[in-house]
């Protein structure tokens, strides 16, 4: 054998040696300490010496045989080296990563996640995470459109879409994106008013910044995709911060007053509309009632006119009596004897006559029959006049 079998002294004073001439009893030195793994070059050298020595001594020490044994030893060493080189070429790409492979320094391909192999010392690779969301922050003092200075901060979230372009299209893609973000933000802020930046225009500024940033990175073709842009803060310089806070508070009060006024309008407008409709309907009803009453009075006087023409005195007296009755019905009445020099005589006519409601009912019934009484009086007068004329005619005829 090329080395001693266990238990075979073979002139080694009872020591068991491994192929490299080390003591094989428990893998320890005589002192009892662990020897540790040997150096790879030292292993190859010792193995070559052992194999060369064994094969060189074979056949009585012939030079040709010794030369063949050395070649075999070097072949074994080469096979071991190749095996080590092959195993060293295996590598693993993570699930969220992609590997960019360079062959002799030149881009060759992109490998997918999993176990891959490359020829060691010929191909090199670099793994890039293409699923992680990365973030960078841009901030600083910026000049607005109305020549004011404002401090703005914005966060940009992005991810890698093309690993090769991310690594080799520009020198440093992250730094290039930071500069592009700062440039886009300054361009948008420079085209906006300070009041809009601090209050209502934040959403518009965020959208405009994202659109401008996409245009810039598309022109650079860096292999990055913008996921989101967040407008973190915008504040005026400390020297004028109090004045801007007052302006913002006044604007908020204005908006609050407007909302309260709108709420009051929404509350009172339906009520006012309903009241207006009610008053309009009442006015229409009053108009119809007054018109009908006037038309009734006109019709009544039109019917009364022939009677008045037939008996003016009687009709006039009757109208006067009805009018006075209507007037005195709604007034308090006191009777006083003005010629008496004694005590004042007070007669409560209203209480004596009864309730005022009964008087009103009586007045209304009398008023409604006024025309009938006048017509009867007129007919009676006409009859008396006719009888008088007949008697006068008979008297004159008797005389003749």
From Swiss-Prot:
Stretches for region Disordered: 1-43, 355-400
Ranges in a coiled coil: none
Main subcellular location of this protein, as a coarse class: membrane
Biased segments, Polar residues type: 384-400
Biased composition (Low complexity): 1-27
Location(s) in or outside the cell: Membrane
GO cellular component terms attached to this protein's record: membrane
Compositionally biased intervals (Basic and acidic residues): 374-383
Regions that span the bilayer: 70-90
Record membrane topology: Single-pass membrane protein
Key words, A-Z: Membrane, Transmembrane, Transmembrane helix
InterPro entries named in the record: Band7/mec-2_domain, Band_7, Band_7/SPFH_dom_sf, HflK, Membrane_HflK_N, Stomatin_HflK_fam
Pfam families assigned: Band_7 (PF01145), HflK_N (PF12221)
Family as reported in the entry's similarity comment: Belongs to the band 7/mec-2 family. HflK subfamily.
Function description: HflC and HflK could encode or regulate a protease.
Name of this protein: Protein HflK
Species of the source: Vibrio parahaemolyticus serotype O3:K6 (strain RIMD 2210633)
Upper lineage: Bacteria, Pseudomonadati, Pseudomonadota, Gammaproteobacteria, Vibrionales
């Amino acid at each position: 054998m090329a080395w001693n079998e266990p238990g075979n002294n073979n002139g080694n004073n009872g020591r068991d040696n491994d192929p490299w001439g080390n003591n094989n009893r428990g893998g320890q030195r005589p002192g009892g300490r662990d020897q540790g793994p040997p150096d790879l070059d030292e292993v190859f050298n010792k193995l070559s010496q052992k194999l060369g020595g064994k094969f060189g001594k074979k056949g009585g020490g012939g030079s040709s045989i010794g030369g063949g044994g050395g070649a075999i030893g070097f072949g074994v060493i080469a096979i071991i080296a190749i095996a080590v080189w092959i195993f060293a070429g295996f590598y693993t790409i993570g699930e969220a990563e992609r590997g960019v492979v360079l062959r002799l320094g030149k881009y060759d391909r992109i490998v997918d996640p999993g176990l891959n192999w490359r020829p060691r010392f010929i191909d090199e690779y670099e793994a890039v995470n293409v699923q992680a969301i990365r973030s960078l922050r841009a901030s600083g003092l910026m000049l607005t459109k109305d020549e004011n200075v404002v401090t703005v901060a914005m966060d940009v979230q992005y991810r890698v879409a093309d690993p090769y372009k991310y690594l080799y299209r520009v020198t440093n893609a992250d730094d290039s994106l930071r500069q592009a973000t700062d440039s886009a933000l300054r361009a948008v802020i420079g085209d906006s008013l300070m009041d809009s930046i601090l209050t209502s225009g934040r959403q518009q500024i965020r959208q405009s910044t994202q659109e401008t940033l996409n245009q810039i990175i598309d022109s650079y073709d860096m292999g990055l995709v913008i996921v989101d842009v967040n407008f973190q803060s915008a504040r005026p310089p400390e020297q004028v911060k109090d004045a801007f806070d007052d302006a913002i508070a006044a604007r908020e009060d204005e908006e609050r007053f407007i909302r309260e006024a709108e709420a009051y309008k929404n509350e009172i407008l339906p009520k006012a509309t309903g009241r207006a409709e009610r008053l309009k309907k009442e006015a229409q009803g009053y108009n119809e009632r007054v018109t009908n009453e006037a038309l009734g009075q006109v019709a009544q006087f039109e019917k009364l006119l022939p009677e008045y023409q037939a008996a003016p005195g009687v009709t006039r007296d009757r109208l006067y009596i009805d009018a006075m009755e209507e007037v005195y019905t709604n007034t308090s009445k006191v009777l006083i004897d003005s010629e008496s020099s004694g005590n004042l005589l007070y007669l409560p006519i209203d209480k004596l006559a009864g309730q005022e409601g009964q008087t009103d009912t009586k007045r209304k019934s009398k008023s409604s029959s006024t025309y009938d009484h006048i017509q009867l009086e007129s007919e009676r007068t006409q009859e008396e006049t006719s009888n008088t004329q007949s008697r006068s005619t008979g008297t004159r005829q008797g005389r003749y």
